[in-house]
Amino acid sequence: MREETREQPAPLRSGLTTGSCATATSLAAARLLLSGETSDAVSITLPKGKVVQMRLEFCRLAGESAEAGTLKDAGDDPDVTHGALLYSQVRLLDEPSIRFVAGSGVGTVTRPGLVLAVGEPAINPVPRRMISEHLQRLADECGYFGGFEVTVNVQGGEQLALKTMNPRLGILGGLSILGTSGIVRPFSCAAYIASIHQGIDVAHTNGYTHIAACTGNASEDTMRRVYGLPEIALIEMGDFVGAVLKHLRKVPVPRLTLCGGFGKISKLAAGHMDLHSRHSSIDLPQLAGWAADIGADAALQAAIIGANTSQQALALAHAAGIALGDAVCAHALAFARSVVPAQVQVEVFAIDRQGGIVGRAGVQ
């Protein structure tokens, strides 16, 4: 077996989530209001008990409110928010409650199906809890019995959000404030997988009975062309087909179409749930075996085994009149069906680099 791309893992630096940034800036602003204390750094406690210190860009009074900001540091993770200025504005309330507001660059939920209700600011539950716990501790220390209004902002967040799944999920106007551990693990993929689950949830809750999970832009374009599916029904799964298949056990959407490049679909056919080259490889001898099952002679089998890429193997089979693309999709279909509930109808498409369909199996 050989990999089609080479990637060498290296030690990477962790960062802090937007939820941690919002907690730190909210705490600093509230402390300034209650005690008059300001500083250029603030310490917060993460959900698992680790204490981290975060540098502040500013902490100042703004009329009856206070505001504090920090630069988001995602470590070595390719996070669109890395380096963005996140700042919180805090206002004191008479009633003992904490009210969250979506400020500039933070989105608002507009579709049902997410963990937050329609109309709520896109500040997820764990960041809300982190902020609330820190502000309550501060209130106890200061003998304060009122509440807080917390407005979270991300400079340039509305444009940054266009690079995320938020528009497709119905989170409009900016980014989501995220995080479950408070720490960004480089390339941990947790946020990506969460967005896949959210995409399925939103499509299902809004009544869509057919979704297409796609590995990239070309496969999404193919699904638009073949089925005319709207954005809400297109799930950008990347390499994480396992995240789609397993989630359908919880949310059994009636019909699932899987669409991806031939090489990635061949990995799914071999039973891989993660299609990235770090975790799964193209098995050319297996491709040759599947070609043999549908009539490939010994010479073609040898040529497939010796191919440089799966695309070359496919081209060799196609030139010999062997429908390897369909065979691979049939094996991928069988594996996918073994994971999802029986009531979910599944089909699989394989495409070439130009988006042309080179294989298909399942519902027609």
From Swiss-Prot:
Pathway connected to this protein: Cofactor biosynthesis; adenosylcobalamin biosynthesis; cob(II)yrinate a,c-diamide from sirohydrochlorin (anaerobic route): step 6/10
Record GO biological process: anaerobic cobalamin biosynthetic process; methylation
One GO MF term attached to the UniProt entry: cobalt-precorrin-5B C1-methyltransferase activity
The entry's keywords: Cobalamin biosynthesis, Methyltransferase, S-adenosyl-L-methionine, Transferase
Entries under Pfam families matching the protein: CbiD
Domain of life: Bacteria
EC class of the enzyme, as a word: transferase
Regions crossing the membrane: none
UniProt xrefs under InterPro entries: CbiD (IPR002748), CbiD_sf (IPR036074)
Reactions listed under catalytic activity: Co-precorrin-5B + S-adenosyl-L-methionine = Co-precorrin-6A + S-adenosyl-L-homocysteine
EC number(s) recorded for this UniProt protein: 2.1.1.195
Family statement: Belongs to the CbiD family.
HAMAP family associated with the record: CbiD (MF_00787)
Protein name (Swiss-Prot/TrEMBL): Cobalt-precorrin-5B C(1)-methyltransferase
Protein's organism: Pseudomonas putida (strain GB-1)
Organism ancestry: Bacteria, Pseudomonadati, Pseudomonadota, Gammaproteobacteria, Pseudomonadales
Gene: cbiD
